[in-house]
Amino acid sequence: MQRYPTKQIKIRDVLIGGDAPISVQSMTFSKTKDVKGTLEQIQRLYFAGCDIVRCAVFDKEDASALKQIVAGSPIPVVADIHFNHTYALIVSEFVDAIRINPGNIGSAKNIKAVVDACKQRNLPIRIGVNSGSLEKRFEDRYGRTVEAMVESALYNIKLLEDFDFTDIKISLKSSDVERTMQAYRALRPKTNYPFHLGVTEAGTAFHATIKSAIALGGLLLEGIGDTMRVSITGELEEEIKVAKAILKDSGRQKEGLNIISCPTCGRLQADLMAAVKLVEEKTKDIKEPLNVSVMGCVVNAIGEAKGADVAIAFGKGNGMIMRHGEVVARLPESELVDRFLQEIDDEIKSRG
């Protein structure tokens, strides 16, 4: 499905919305006032493929530290503001964007002050609605529901527009997968601002991966979403790895290998798991979009090979390598993976 057409905004040099690629975001978990530690985490995220990073602003020390952090960051830095809008006024002089939580940022007067500061440097604002911290009037009326989240977003969109501000992106996060998806679906036809997708408080790697794959992957398949974060407790690189995989497997990012491998069964006569792990490790940095197949026997190998750029099928002590469905080599098992990797390299080179 085609993506919903959205307004395009810019965070430093990263475009969000419109026809821009869907960007991947994350958040540091160091104390932001620890400049060295925070920059180390940002570097890790950058090398993992993160496009935008967010840093918490808990106090004035955090706010002041962001000046050095932004100067040393290779990717755009978003200040995450809760409760005290004056921190947004401080950081607006040097960060690349600001996220506010309408549930705790305070009065319209406070928001106007933030908007006025952002206008000075053309900084985008993310309206970050969270089902766990909704404005009292919306929670009292609707409870912690999809309706409350959508009404909060619409109210704050209009508020910013009334202040003549339209460099906006929106998020509607919940720890509940279904509520998250329903909120984004409900708001999408009512505004053309870009959406930041995420499931908040998603948990540790296993649970967060499943929740995010369902919610974010499902929304992406419906054409919803312009930027995203996979939230994983205590992880950095893993957030980016999972987000990139969701983008690739939803068809929204044409980059890297799509590795097809069988789940194994009683017909297996080779160490397929070791072979797949080795292929994954050796090809993890490849950017060329390729379909490769690693199969344990010939039952499905021939069929999968027809749809693969490069394929390998193991047998008993031997196997075969295929390119675009055609057998190019039959070799002993000990030589198969090395030849397979060589064929992948050759396929990439053949594309120029």
Swiss-Prot record:
Query: Which of this chain's residues are annotated to bind [4Fe-4S] cluster?
Result: 262, 265, 297, 304
| Claim: Metal-binding is one of the keywords in the record | yes
Give the keywords, sorted. 4Fe-4S, Iron, Iron-sulfur, Isoprene biosynthesis, Metal-binding, Oxidoreductase
Q: Reply yes or no: does the keyword Cytoplasm apply.
A: no
Q: Which reaction does it catalyse?
A: (2E)-4-hydroxy-3-methylbut-2-enyl diphosphate + oxidized [flavodoxin] + H2O + 2 H(+) = 2-C-methyl-D-erythritol 2,4-cyclic diphosphate + reduced [flavodoxin]
InterPro entries in alphabetical order:
Dihydropteroate_synth-like_sf, IspG_bac, IspG_bac-typ, NO2/SO3_Rdtase_4Fe4S_sf
Q: What pathway does the UniProt record associate with this protein?
A: Isoprenoid biosynthesis; isopentenyl diphosphate biosynthesis via DXP pathway; isopentenyl diphosphate from 1-deoxy-D-xylulose 5-phosphate: step 5/6
- Which GO BP terms sit in this record? isopentenyl diphosphate biosynthetic process, methylerythritol 4-phosphate pathway; terpenoid biosynthetic process
- Origin superkingdom: Bacteria
Q: What does this protein do?
A: Converts 2C-methyl-D-erythritol 2,4-cyclodiphosphate (ME-2,4cPP) into 1-hydroxy-2-methyl-2-(E)-butenyl 4-diphosphate.
Tell me what this protein is called: 4-hydroxy-3-methylbut-2-en-1-yl diphosphate synthase (flavodoxin)
Q: Which organism is it from?
A: Campylobacter concisus (strain 13826)
Q: What is the lineage of its organism?
A: Bacteria, Pseudomonadati, Campylobacterota, Epsilonproteobacteria, Campylobacterales
